A protein has these predicted regions:
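Bacterial Sec-dependent N-terminal signal peptides
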Residues: 1-36
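Sequence/structural signature of beta-propeller domains
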Residues: 24-286
């Protein structure tokens, strides 16, 4: 019996590390990309230091350029479609604020402030730009918004709660703004079930907080970024969850902006972490 123990002990010492290493290898997390994209094959552009704190970006199909804005300053920047350099800028508000996202409805540009206020930027036939107060969502309690997108079928701009007190962290509410008629509808357009997001996520986080969203021009699905949880959530246009993808921190250190070109190419902006902000391009794969 003693002899068996003598030979079994070295075997145990050798096997345990081997089993441990195999176990670690099996647990290595694999990041998956949504259909038609490869998130490990990005094209990366560094952005001007003036938009170091880029909070939103949108592609303008009519002018064939990107429009972006900073987090705290009331300035929008027009970026060259190829170099991503700043072509021109426009001060839409002299007041510092928490400006979170940008969208285009028809020909007008809209900027969302975190308290649910919208700014409308109109360019007339001479090229002169003016800013108008487009209204503010009236909702009880403390509310924080970071996401604004345009729904062409509804003919409405939609804002998503990042953290709204009435949601009680159980859902994420969406509210519609109708620029051609009533303005804001203070009743929720739809809600996104945060528990469902967690149940579908490869890594449940309980931190789903939308930071940007756009409707895919080809797939007609809603793509939602959540920087806080490093997730890309795909839903139908009524907020019903369909897929959840985890975003690698080394590629998306602080993903704050999302937009698409009409051909399906996806662009995600990273706010600067150490030096310059970035704009990542992910080509649409047929």
């Amino acid at each position: 019996m003693e002899r068996f123990k003598f030979f079994a002990w070295p075997f145990y010492i050798v096997c345990v590390p081997v089993i441990f290493l195999i176990s670690c290898k099996q647990k290595k997390f694999i990041y998956k990309s949504p259909p038609h994209y490869n998130f490990s094959n990005e094209f990366r552009d560094k952005l001007d230091l003036r938009i170091k704190e880029i909070s939103g970006i949108v592609w303008d199909n009519q002018s064939d350029e990107f429009i972006a804005h900073n987090d705290e300053k009331g300035i929008i920047f027009y970026l060259d479609r190829d170099t991503k350099g700043i072509k021109r800028e426009f001060v839409f508000s002299e007041t510092k604020g928490d400006y979170e996202d940008i969208a285009i409805a028809k020909k007008d540009v809209y900027v969302l402030r975190s308290d649910g206020k919208l700014f409308r930027i109109v360019t007339d036939s001479t090229g002169k730009q003016n800013t108008f107060d487009a209204g503010q969502l009236q909702s009880s309690g403390k509310n924080d918004f970071e996401t604004l997108y345009y729904d062409a079928e509804r003919k409405a701009l939609v804002i998503l709660c990042k953290n709204c007190s009435t949601d009680e962290k159980k859902v994420v509410s969406a509210y519609a703004y109708y620029p051609d008629s009533i303005g804001f509808d203070n009743k929720a357009l739809f809600t996104i079930d945060t528990k469902m997001v967690d149940s579908m996520s490869p890594r449940p986080t309980s931190r789903f907080q939308p930071s940007a969203a756009r409707i895919h021009p080809i797939l007609k699905k809603l793509f939602i970024l959540s920087s806080a949880s490093n997730q890309l959530v795909v839903t139908d246009l009524n907020g019903n969850d369909e897929n959840v993808y985890m975003l690698a921190k080394k590629i998306f250190p602080q993903a704050e902006g999302l937009t698409f070109k009409s051909n399906g190419d996806m662009y995600i902006s990273n706010e600067a972490v150490s030096s310059k902000a970035e704009l990542l391009k992910f080509p649409y794969i047929q």
